[in-house]
């Protein structure tokens, strides 16, 4: 069955879940990265003032990522039995949850590994999943939920049209940290790399706007691909395709609170 995908929901450290059976492995195509899921959701539950001390919850996954073929899961398990939906897990009040959820999904899609996103997450569901009921489609009558769905649609489109996000998911050459030591600022930056393109992903998970000096070797210009803070997604920024011009690979970027941005290098 060449078109069937076998994924293992496994929280153990057993080596070789995705190695071929002929090599002593279990033969799965992918293994759910439960560590990434737990660390990421715990981070976004945390109040912004405490995120600095939890900064490396979002860097730890790359310490072990290449040990198996990991898949990043935001599955049905995370939106049932009193755990709250993905949107509800975000810190803060109603209006604060949406920009954080958008930034979370930008981080997820830029991070190496295939993605699993459970139905209802894309509309900002507030009610936990119930197999006896359909999704709460009436949420799409509300502007923030409309904008969130629009964001998820565009995020999927950007992901699918830029091989840097997926071509070398399981190749060490496909990912490189730009900056993972901004504990006080809660800023992260890394590159995704394919044979023909490079994309820089930059995140500000603090509750304040910040200017940041982004350093990318050999880069002269950056072309904006996507910002989680564009107005059509519920943010405050006007969409712009204007390229950023740097000097000696250094770019000054303005990072809104709770935001992510992708740039074609």
Language-model segments: residues:
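Carbohydrate-interacting/catalytic domains
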Residues: 96-98, 109-117, 121-265
